[in-house]
Amino acid sequence: MSQNIQIGTRKRSRANMNNSTTTGPANNTSSNKTFLDNFEETRTNKLLDEMFARQNSFLTDNLRNSLDLNQADNPLRPRQHQHQLFLDNENAIELDEEPRIINTTINNSNNHNSSRVDEDADDDIIFIKEQPIQFSSPLILPSSSSINNNNNIVTSNNPGCGTAATSNSTYITTPKKFKKQRTISLPQLPLSKLSYQSNYFNVPDQTNAIVPRVTQTENELLHLTGSCAKTLEGNKAVNLTIAHSTSPFSNPPAQIASLPQSNLKKQIGSSLRKFTSNGSSESASSNKSNFKTDKDGHYVYQENDIFGSGGRFVVKDLLGQGTFGKVLKCIDNKYEPNYVAVKVIRAVDRYREAAKTELRILQTILNNDPQGQFQCLLLRECFDYKNHICLVTDLYGRSIYDFMCSNGIARFPGSHIQAIARQLIRSVCFLHDLGIIHTDLKPENILICDETHIAQKLPLKTVQSLSKRRREASKGKRKILKNPEIKIIDFGSAIFHYEYHPPVISTRHYRAPEIVLGLGWSFPCDIWSIACVLVELVIGESLYPIHENLEHMAMMQRINGTPFPTDIIDKMFYKSKHKLGNSPSDLNSTVIKHFDRKTLSLQWPEKNKRGDTITTEKSMKRVLQSCDRLDIYISKVLKQDYGDSLSINWNLPPEKNWSLINSKLAWKRQTHSSSSSTTDELDKETFLFWYWFIDLLRKMFEFDPTKRITAKDALDHEWFNLGILDDGIATYNNTQG
């Protein structure tokens, strides 16, 4: 079923409209005016009809096969309101005030009231789209928020939402700030509209009601170390089932029980003689060779290895490995579907303890989300086999990282980025309400549920510009997923917020500044990591491709367009001086020494005592040439798809940004010049989509963790009310290969 689109006009009555003639001697030319008015009205109606037809055709073609949520085989078919459609005026966004396809100006005779802000100040053309949704998404206000008489949200002491700036140099957005005028509602993927409601959760400390936390206070972050005792106490309560090796008897127990008594004695005697003469039975020998452990406690991967009680699991592939152990693709001979993923932990006490923490976290997630609706990997079962803790989970597709590496164009469509962002933030919101901090969010730990995709052959010139590895992996094609549903995995580094906090967490590229600076860390570190992931989906590569602290901090300042706030640097010095909390062992040598104690500013490029620059030229290029302020950096990448006219300045309001872009587009139309074939595809809806995306990133990349936007506030951000027409919408659940 294709989407139904209704197009209509919203008409308003005005007291002083001159659309009727008056009688009397003063109106001698009334008949002429009536004729002209009728002529202009007919001409205008004809132009409007043409515009409606073109818009209707444009939107219908883009939506016809894109968002068919009523297919029986669609896994994302709405579970709630399944047979209801709604008129999506809520998601309306601004259009250009001067539509290009209409050259006729309709004058308002009530000019003396034009400056008056009135709800009926103009005749808007509204495009109303019927769009199914999966869940309702009510507005959740922070505890410190209220609604004033003008139906505006008033927030006090809530840094996540932002406030109006007093300086003209910086523009800071607030929700519902702009009046919506000529509007059009573009489609969104169902995953982009997933809702989140605060619930009552069951957590290990028997606390049933978790109060959604707005942020962390300064004192919490400064002194936060967690409790080792609570971690050890929790791990002691973990009970693991011991999976025994296969019996030395060749017959299974059921078969042995069915043997006559005389035959049973012969069978036992024969097996014992064979066992004692050879030192082990054939089965025991087979088991020993099937599941080997090296001197470092790692399981030695071997295809077709058999392990688990009764030889339940058969190893078929190696999915991943690390310091913790290995992840295997296995056949489960007990349950269907047969293929599962088994995480085999190193047989070392340190990693076994960490696995017990992971097990408690996975069990908490399972208890509170048995259906897996919050995009977290669910634990099937666990057991202990030959001193290896084994965690069994469902098997999904490749990670986002692997998918990007095998793609000719690593960048994701905007609609897919929004869908993935919604799932990630919503999942983290759920985890944070459970008191869980993931600490290691990155593309490698985000799995794609369904890898089916549409492959588009790339132009020869583009293929030739690819690296040899990417060219071979992608076969010269761009892959666009049909369904961007994801699962978050690897809770091996996750912690409960009240338990022990290691001094260093997260993979370097996704590490928050409070961790680098040796400050306390908590829930906000996950938000920073998500922001890094989202930028990577846009630009197709890591935002921070670095391996040491000084370069990392210099890049952070350049991308944020501002130095580190002096108050958090002052806290860093204070914490180091008084030895508060946990600090990285190399904090003084790799971080603190690069800050001036008087100005509290980062000293980069690095200089020696004589004032000579000692930072390498290669490092200088990485910082100065490979990145820029985030809005400028992303704009450069988006120009590849939308032309040179797209430019976003986060210090200017959206209307000012669009005015500048529109001027560029008008100049190009007049001069008939275009540097890109896609330049004319840029419209205001597309610009606003990316503008508010960058605005959300800016709030997620806040240096001060106490002011960084929370997961719950991020779900209410304006960006999630906006749609976009792109390849991600067009290929959603497309039946063609």
From Swiss-Prot:
It comes from the Eukaryota. One of its GO terms (cellular component) is cytoplasm. Residues 15-33 have a biased composition (Polar residues). GO terms for molecular function: ATP binding; protein kinase activity; protein serine kinase activity; protein serine/threonine kinase activity; protein serine/threonine/tyrosine kinase activity; protein tyrosine kinase activity. Its EC number is 2.7.12.1. Transmembrane segments: none annotated. Pfam families: Pkinase (PF00069). Residues 313-720 form the Protein kinase domain. The keyword Acetylation does not apply. The keyword Kinase applies. Residues 277-290 have a biased composition (Low complexity). The active site is at D440 (proton acceptor). GO terms for biological process: negative regulation of transcription by RNA polymerase III; regulation of RNA splicing. PROSITE patterns: PROTEIN_KINASE_ATP, PROTEIN_KINASE_DOM, PROTEIN_KINASE_ST. The modification Phosphothreonine is found at T562. It catalyses: L-seryl-[protein] + ATP = O-phospho-L-seryl-[protein] + ADP + H(+); L-threonyl-[protein] + ATP = O-phospho-L-threonyl-[protein] + ADP + H(+); L-tyrosyl-[protein] + ATP = O-phospho-L-tyrosyl-[protein] + ADP + H(+). It is an enzyme of class 2 (transferase). InterPro entries: CLK_kinases, Kinase-like_dom_sf, Prot_kinase_dom, Protein_kinase_ATP_BS, Ser/Thr_kinase_AS. PANTHER family: SERINE/THREONINE-PROTEIN KINASE DOA-RELATED, SERINE_THREONINE-PROTEIN KINASE DOA. Nonessential protein kinase. Belongs to the protein kinase superfamily. CMGC Ser/Thr protein kinase family. Lammer subfamily. This is Dual specificity protein kinase KNS1. It comes from Saccharomyces cerevisiae (strain ATCC 204508 / S288c) (Baker's yeast). The gene is KNS1.
